[in-house]
């Protein structure tokens, strides 16, 4: 048996997994206190701010692309819908896995199914994430059925596919916005630059923009590493829609700050103001400015760079809401422990590995890796023989 070639990135991957395995052992057998720098003043850290808030946001490409293709009939984007679906499905599985580390008693998570509190935003988020992950699994089944040539179950799942797409869009819309609603109960704790009654709306708009940015990012990375061609017209089209969503987000965000008379906080010499401008600069100000030039918005390589900026900016946004905006009230500066970071990196590394294996062995892209033979073979072409040769 031939051993895999040792490369730099494979070595990094193994080291991340080993550190994550050790941190997982410490977390399970010694508890949250030994693994994290969380406290009563800072009960939510990187596992909530990044793994949950950012993880759910970064997985938004699934509902964005599936809505475009199957609801708004933008069939030209169908070749990149499956990679977006795979990213969404993996993203939610990893979000659930990461949540288990943050819960003091993870086995109690099942109680959300039986102990209902309809007035709780967290109850709604829990149910929506659970149901949406189930819907994503059902939407992903046709890919598995195609790979193993299971014609009958494939026909059955396709009959209910439209219902699944509609359910997925509704559920994703609900909990993407509800993650913002979680912070509406802390008006005196969250910094004015981030606290607003419009937080659920801003979370949803940014999720749509990030879904498009993630699709551009993953399409570019997949083309580079898996050797298939990059669909330039599709990437350019996604870039134009992303520009529109970023403009909408930027207008709503800045208008909200101005209307609530808190914009002056952005110009004070504070740590919060610095983080706000980093978030705004990377998230929408610089991307909008760059994409106003045709040579940027019509070039896939430059759109890839813009998508990295957008992703970085909105990841900062979620971390600012979860951590930076709370530090002024708590009086503590939260710096995650290395074991927290190693577990987060391990979750991300496992996700990248599973994505790579799925692309290799399943029909994710319209051509190339993992593509099975057609379920119905085309007829053999007939050879025409001239009458004079008979």
Indicate residue ranges for each PLM-predicted region.
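Long, contiguous internal "core" modules enriched in hydrophobic/ aromatic residues
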Residues: 2-6, 13-20, 74-76, 114-118, ...
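TerminUS-proximal long segments
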Residues: 5, 298-390
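Alpha-helical transmembrane segments of multi-pass membrane proteins
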Residues: 13-34, 97-103, 170-181, 355, ...
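Hydrophobic alpha-helical membrane-insertion segments
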Residues: 13-20, 89-96, 305-314
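Membrane-interface helix-loop junction between the first two transmembrane segments
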Residues: 25-42, 71-74
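Membrane helical hairpin/interfacial module
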Residues: 42-107
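C-terminal halves and exits of single transmembrane alpha-helices
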Residues: 86-106, 126-137, 314, 318-321
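Aromatic-anchored segments of alpha-helical transmembrane domains
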Residues: 93-94, 172, 249-252, 309-319
